[in-house]
Amino acid sequence: MTLSAEDRFAISELLARASYAYDQRDLPLLESCLCDDAAISFRVAGGDLVGPFSGREAMMAVYRDAMESQSDVRRHVVSNAMFTPKDAEVDVISNLTLFATKDGSTVLLTVGLYHDTVRLDDGEWRILKRHVELDSAY
């Protein structure tokens, strides 16, 4: 698969849209970023693997549960995306910087990497797999 500049931009926008949707707690927008058979997994500070949680509904349940436990305002900043096309999918590694604001104070919570696999789904790039690798717990 050859990846055009337009595809790279669309995939970068997908990752930004997913972060924005989570931060704004816009569940319909977040869900629209995911393939039906999407999956998510996590590892914090080299610890045990959590997940994968398979299927869009399971992935959305992970997001909803996380949101319910948070009383602050989150800002997920995605940067430095690198793309590796393979067959009908694209692997994307990007940096994650996570900030939180509460009571007028903003703090850096953690940094890490997103390891995403995206694919075209009904003409739109969507997240098929997401592995979140955090450098530290928060």
Residue ranges and their predicted role:
Residues 23, 53, 110:
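Short glycine/serine/threonine-biased micro-segments
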Residues 27-95:
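A solvent-exposed, acidic/Ser-Thr-rich amphipathic alpha-helical stretch
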Residues 5, 50-53, 105:
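Charge-dense, low-complexity intrinsically disordered segments
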Residues 68-138:
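A beta-strand edge to alpha-helix "cap/lid" segment located at domain peripheries
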Residues 1-36:
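Short, low-complexity N-terminal intrinsically disordered segments enriched in polar/charged residues
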